[in-house]
A protein has these predicted regions:
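Composition- and surface-driven signal marking solvent-exposed, interaction-prone regions
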Residues: 159, 213, 229-233, 257-264, ...
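Acidic, metal-ligating active-site segments
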Residues: 128-136, 395-411
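Active/binding-pocket-proximal capping segment
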Residues: 365, 432-434, 495
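Non-cytosolic beta-sheet module surface loops
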Residues: 391-393
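Acidic, metal-coordinating catalytic cores used for nucleic-acid/nucleotide bond scission
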Residues: 121, 490-495
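Nucleic-acid-processing active sites and adjacent nucleic-acid-binding tracks
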Residues: 187-191, 404-488
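Phosphate/NTP-binding elements of NTP-utilizing enzymes
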Residues: 2-389, 480-484
Length: 495
């Protein structure tokens, strides 16, 4: 797709110009300098198509009130001066995408909004503004608003931004009956809406179970267990009007459920298959740029930074940001490994896992396979083994890897220990343990026939009636193996 031509063929209705006209101008300018990605363009074009369909109305009065309200919010700038919040053109569009389109009876069209862009693009800052609108200005009344966050010690970042607006404005503070910064909750006395923050780790699902909340916001969704959004939406399912807003940046867990969700949303965007009640904003490099791994080019990482890279007009490139991040990009591309992984995921908003050249790939590992097993190795006299043990307390799998050096002939035949050998190689045997009651669930979820390995490489635990890993059972099995096969553990590493 020629983005530069396609964006110029879009038509902005006159009645929408005051709300998204600046964003459209920014898109045209960014396309001219190759800093507009196809995904972001498609998100905007889809919004225009939905409006043009005449199925929905645009709530111009409500959106004017929303922008007027957000403009009244006060923040402290880098120089320590109080300033009223000014939204970037792209942020105005996001607000219109979430709240602007209404059904004929006045209800919100969107009940799920997914916002994906690079780090340092004001996502948490914007969400804190969204929370203030939801708490005090939206149509919701006496509702529980869930803020789910999962960034470890930074879990309160969005809530802190929320409370800073209150601290900076005594008039806004008067609208709250209580703000508890320690327990992370607040209540608006005008609407009765209450905001509660949950950290999505450990027993978060249990904490959220049973909540029948209409409104929820998730900060850094792609760091959450995928069950968290599902649990929240379960609590919203029976409401006619509900809203879930999530924001995130790409991660490095390629192939995970969250990654699959990301890919599915993108695929549906490109196939025009997204439901009308889903608003997606996705700022990322184009596919061909990712495939070419041109991560050091500003025309790659710049497409994922619609706020960070530009001045308030949304298209004039900030010189100091361009220079700073160009330097970061060059350094990451030179260093590779985890440095490149960090830059690609955080600033290119692309899913990427570091390639460690000291490790082989899965296919290379398969090519190292031999036609003899552990029992034959022991029979040949190899009884000195290294054991690496990973005992899991939270996951459904514990594993032990057994390693020893063996000798082979030129044709790859296993030789007896201490025989003259053409080469020596590292023989590896892996044993894993899984709770008995979790086997079928993993077969269905992972689409992998674990049953083919039960009793040989995979052993089932009956701890807690088959629901948990039974560590003593693992040690007993290893001890039995030691006694029967007469092997010695030279190195035993419990991690």
């Amino acid at each position: 797709m020629n983005i530069e031509d396609a964006v110029k063929h879009l038509h902005i209705p006159h009645e929408l110009n005051e709300f998204i006209g600046d964003y459209y101008k920014a898109l045209v300018k960014r396309a001219d300098i190759d800093l507009l990605g196809e995904s972001e363009f498609r998100c905007f074009a889809r919004f225009l198509e939905m409006y043009a369909s005449s199925r929905y109305q645009f709530a111009d009065k409500a959106m004017r009130r929303l922008f007027q309200f957000l403009h009244m919010l006060i923040y402290i700038d880098e120089d320590g001066k109080p300033r009223h919040l000014e939204l970037y053109p792209v942020q105005k569009f996001i607000m219109c995408g979430i709240f602007g389109l209404r059904t004929p009876d006045g209800g919100y069209v969107v009940n799920t909004a997914n916002l994906y862009m690079a780090r340092r693009n004001g996502k948490s800052f914007l969400l804190s503004g969204v929370l203030h609108y939801l708490m005090g200005m939206s149509k919701f009344r006496n509702e529980l608003i869930v803020l789910a966050s999962c960034k470890g010690q930074n879990a309160t970042i969005c809530f802190n931004e929320f409370t800073k607006f209150i601290e900076n404005d005594p008039y806004l503070a008067e609208t709250f009956s209580n703000v508890n910064k320690t327990a992370c909750w607040a209540k608006n006395k005008n609407t009765g809406n209450r905001l509660d923050m949950f950290r999505t780790g450990g027993g978060a699902k249990n904490s959220l179970d049973g909540y029948t909340n209409k409104v929820a916001v998730i900060d850094e969704e792609m760091l959450c267990d995928e069950i968290i959004p599902k649990t929240i939406q379960d609590g919203q399912a029976h409401f006619k009007d509900s809203l879930l807003v999530t924001m995130s940046t790409a991660q490095f867990s390629v192939g995970s459920d969250n990654h699959k969700k990301w890919l599915t949303l993108r695929k549906m965007l490109y196939e025009d298959a997204l439901l009308d009640n889903v608003f997606l904003f996705l700022a990322e490099p184009n596919l061909e740029e990712l495939q070419a791994k041109e991560f050091g080019q500003i025309t790659t990482w710049g497409k994922a930074n619609p706020v960070l890279l530009f001045e308030a007009d949304g298209f004039t490139v900030k010189k100091h940001i361009k220079e700073k991040y160009a330097q970061k990009a060059r350094a990451a591309c030179t260093e590779k490994g985890f440095a490149l992984q960090s830059f690609v995921t955080k600033q290119c908003n692309a899913w990427y896992s570091a390639e460690d050249r000291s490790l082989c790939s899965y296919d290379q590992l398969k090519d190292c396979g031999v036609d003899y097993g552990m029992e034959e190795v022991i029979t040949k006299g190899y009884i000195d083994w290294y054991l690496g043990v990973d005992l899991s307390q939270t996951l459904d799998l514990s594993s032990v890897v057994l390693l020893c050096f063996v000798g082979e002939s030129k044709t790859g035949k296993l030789l007896k220990k201490n025989s003259p050998a053409a080469r020596h190689r590292l023989f590896m045997h892996v044993m894993s343990w899984m709770p008995e009651n979790k086997l079928q669930a993993h077969i269905e979820k992972d689409k992998f026939s674990y049953t083919d390995y039960v009793g040989t490489e995979l052993f089932l635990c009956n701890g807690a009636g088959g629901d948990n890993i039974d560590t003593p059972q693992i040690f007993e099995q290893l001890d039995t193996l030691r006694k029967c096969q007469v092997f010695l553990g030279n190195s035993f590493d419990c991690q």
